[in-house]
Amino acid sequence: PPRSTLFPYTTLFRSMGKLQLPNTIKMVVTDFDGILTDNCVYINEDFTMSRKLNFKDIMGVHLLRKNGLQIAIISGEKNSAIETLAKKFKIEEIHQDIRIKIDVLKSLIEKYSLSQEEYVYIGDDVNDLECLNFAKYKITVPHAVEKLKSAEGIQITENNGGDGAFREVADCLIG
């Protein structure tokens, strides 16, 4: 969206529910389990694992991509559902089985020359804490661990992960 002609250097903020994010965001960096999923693993009869995705969140991914925003997924797990989602929506930045997420976040910031005003980080557990503390715009979900919900500057979605939280962020960003 265009910046104000009266105040060309003013960052405009969009609000949706509890969330407030600037119009300068170019990339959404997110965890997968607990944000795009309900944080549960389902064990099938053949001992394979499955995860549940909500169509509201999938539509959120679609809307962000359609509106030109980049999405990066940094997950502590390796999961074929991430690869399927990435392929369908042409998400290039997929980082799986990552133990120290902050290194990946910093490399994304450098690769895309992002300022603190140009990305938002979404996470739900202690392995996201370092990234959340580093980011200026940080979001978690209601079922996140307490340590995250009390982090300075954190915003909390109304919906849980895997139940519309990602869509809530997308709606806030695209208006």
Q: What would you call each of these model-derived segments?
A:
Residues 12, 34, 64, 86, ...:
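Terminal peptide-recognition signature
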